[in-house]
Amino acid sequence: GFGCPLDQMQCHRHCQTITGRSGGYCSGPLKLTCTCYR
């Protein structure tokens, strides 16, 4: 979701809109999941 697996920057920008999150990346077996980090 949120751009994954093809557009990791979309995932990153999505996570930046979440309070307390500094970014995100695609994770999981096929990079299908957008994972946010602090």
Curated annotation (Swiss-Prot):
Compartments where found: Secreted
Xref: InterPro entries: Defensin_invertebrate/fungal, Scorpion_toxin-like_sf
Coiled-coil zones: none
Chief subcellular location: secreted
GO biological process terms on file: defense response to bacterium; innate immune response
Job description of the protein: Mediates the inducible antibacterial activity in larvae of A.cyanea.
Family recorded in the similarity comment: Belongs to the invertebrate defensin family. Type 2 subfamily.
Cellular component GO terms, alphabetical: extracellular region
Keywords associated with the record: Antibiotic, Antimicrobial, Defensin, Disulfide bond, Immunity, Innate immunity, Secreted
This protein's name: Defensin
Cystine crosslinks: C4-C26, C11-C34, C15-C36
